[in-house]
């Protein structure tokens, strides 16, 4: 995920947490709020009680990668925060990807892009 696609300032995190809506999953919590620009920005929060700095950074990298893989499917115009929960520590990669996708769908931020049919691809 590029730097311009990330939430960075504490003010932005506070705005999303206080003024947005929240959905939960055993691995992650998703908070969303309308963005000021027509793009998607993501932030990730991992509390200190979830492990050492090395572990917390690994969790952030995993969520960032799962989000990057579906970034084009997220409807623009939203700021998104993923909060890592304790169950994340033992989750497999597939479970993490599924949790990210499911939360985005619950929040109605999932934008299915039309896939061209076989006939369209081959003329």
Curated annotation (Swiss-Prot):
One Gene Ontology CC term in the entry: ribonuclease P complex
GO molecular function: 3'-tRNA processing endoribonuclease activity; ribonuclease P activity; tRNA binding
Keyword Transport included in the entry's annotation: no
Top-level taxon: Bacteria
EC number: 3.1.26.5
GO biological process: tRNA 5'-leader removal
Chemical reaction(s) catalysed: Endonucleolytic cleavage of RNA, removing 5'-extranucleotides from tRNA precursor
Keyword Plastid: no
The entry's keywords: Endonuclease, Hydrolase, Nuclease, RNA-binding, tRNA processing
InterPro entries cross-referenced by the UniProt entry: Ribosomal_Su5_D2-typ_SF (IPR020568), Ribsml_uS5_D2-typ_fold_subgr (IPR014721), RNase_P (IPR000100)
Function statement: RNaseP catalyzes the removal of the 5'-leader sequence from pre-tRNA to produce the mature 5'-terminus. It can also cleave other RNA substrates such as 4.5S RNA. The protein component plays an auxiliary but essential role in vivo by binding to the 5'-leader sequence and broadening the substrate specificity of the ribozyme.
Sequence similarity: Belongs to the RnpA family.
Assembly with partners or alone: Consists of a catalytic RNA component (M1 or rnpB) and a protein subunit.
Record protein name field: Ribonuclease P protein component
Gene: rnpA
């Amino acid at each position: 995920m590029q730097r311009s696609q990330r939430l960075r300032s504490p003010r932005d995190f506070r705005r999303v947490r206080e003024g947005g809506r929240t959905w939960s999953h055993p691995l992650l919590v998703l908070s969303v709020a309308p963005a000021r620009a027509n793009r998607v920005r993501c932030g990730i929060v991992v509390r200190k009680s979830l492990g050492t700095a090395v572990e917390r950074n690994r969790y952030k990298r995993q969520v960032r990668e799962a989000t990057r893989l579906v970034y084009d499917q997220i409807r623009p115009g939203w700021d998104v925060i993923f909060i890592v929960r304790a169950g994340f520590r033992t989750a497999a990669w597939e479970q993490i990807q599924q949790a990210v996708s499911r939360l985005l769908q619950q929040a109605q931020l999932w934008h299915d892009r039309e896939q061209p049919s076989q006939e369209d691809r081959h003329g």
